[in-house]
Amino acid sequence: MKIFFFFISIILIISFLFLKSYFNRNIMKPEDFQNTSPTIKIEKYFEGQVKAWGLLQDRKGKVTRQFKADMFGRFENNTLTLEEEFFWNDGEKQKRVWNIEKIDEHNYIGTAADVVGKAKGFSYGSAFKFEYDLIVPIKGKNIKISFDDWIFKQDEEIAINRATLKKFGFKVGELTVFFKKINN
């Protein structure tokens, strides 16, 4: 009888995980924005100086942290080098340098010191989607978090970023960022 309940439990767990992944799949695709404007090309938008303001929310929507950021990008040899410096409201300072290679009109590959493997980017119309796993320090431990990042260009100066953060396929938070390109 114990074996029967064990197998039923396994079947229920597998069914739950399957249904969760089915209903949580992202049905929005970069190609959906093919004919939208203004067109975002990250190698142009992030070239030069950009300011950012953002907030981090937990899985329930509670704002847990906020930041301001200074960014500076250079585009050379088909690669955007984007230096980011974050100033968190709890006093933490953080730096990241992205190297994002433009593969073709729509596809990008990115790397950074705290990114696991390579980030995949897709640009269509006014939207840029970036998928990557980031090592995030949380309570003294380094945790791998998956980011599903969307940037939507609003005009020549403003872009809005919305990211879903996941661990083991489960949503653990959201990140909202407003970018302002500084005329250089």
Q: Model regions: which residues?
A:
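Glycine-rich, aromatic-bearing surface loops/beta-hairpins
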Residues: 153-184
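Amphipathic/hydrophobic helical signal segments and adjacent flexible N-terminal regions
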Residues: 1-47, 51-62, 184
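Edge/loop elements at the starts and ends of beta-strands within beta-rich repeat scaffolds
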Residues: 43-48, 77-78, 154
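Short structured motifs
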Residues: 34-38, 68-69, 114-118, 146-148
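Surface-exposed interaction patches
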Residues: 120, 128-130, 146-150, 158-160
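Amphipathic hydrophobic-ligand
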Residues: 63-69, 142-147, 171-175
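Central antiparallel beta-sheet cores of small beta-barrel/beta-sandwich binding domains
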Residues: 53-138
